[in-house]
Amino acid sequence: MSTSAALAGTPAQPMADLAALKARQHGAWSSGDYAVVGTTLQIVGESLCEALDLRAGSTVLDVAAGNGNGSLAAARRWCAVTATDYVPALLEKAKERAKADRLMMEFQEADAENLPFADQSFDYAMSIFGVMFTPAQERAAAELLRVCKSGGSIGLANWTPDGFIGQLFKTIGRHVPPPTGARSPALWGTRARLEELFPSSKASVVATPRQFVFRYKSSAHWLDVFRTFYGPVLKAFGTLDATGQKVLAAELMELAARFNRAEDGTMVVPSEYLEVVIMRR
């Protein structure tokens, strides 16, 4: 890769640990049915496309597109969209949604850490709660910079460490620790880490805190949906014995109660994320 060198100030990670984490994550995202949860996040894709100020006819690459929230939003704005993910089942869900909405776009299986596109191929690159989960963070950031045209923009939506989803993953990590040396995905939700990944010599970073609101019938309903359909939570419970599952469930219910602003028995939980626009120099 033309921009794959490690960024200054960021220590290298043990390759064996990154490989183990990547294999674990692939299994997690391939399990359950992420689209059940992912489609509720569609508003984030619409907001990010507006923040990017997309222009009709421009080329857009959606990296780790999942079920296509960003891709569909960009296609609605008459962009030429290529949706990529390394989990084929997720791309199939995105295809189903595009067909239902009668939107034209391209789909390609691809690894965010090794994108199969030439340098400066796209006017825009984006990732919504996707690239932040790559084990080799520097490599994934370098790939986004590489495929985006000079003068183009990269748009990201990343959960923050202190928000609800950031705390969800922190809670899970206490019960199912990641491989040694792995960096938290939620670091992508901090300005300091973004400035390491996208240094000022290559890009300018504008990060705006936003809130996505999870709305469920109750906290128990939310937990049931996430345990059944959201791969990382499903897999976490699957690695624990009955006692461990009970403890984790109790802690997640406590977490939901702490963030819940509803007082009528339902669940209304804001979760902070960073909406990021990166201008490629």
Feature map (PLM): residue ranges:
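Conserved Class I S-adenosyl-L-methionine
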Residues: 186-281
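Conserved catalytic/acceptor-binding region of the Class I
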Residues: 138-139, 145, 149-218, 233
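Conserved class I S-adenosyl-L-methionine
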Residues: 5-55, 69, 93, 223, ...
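A short SAM/SAH-binding and catalytic strip from SAM-dependent methyltransferases
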Residues: 123-137
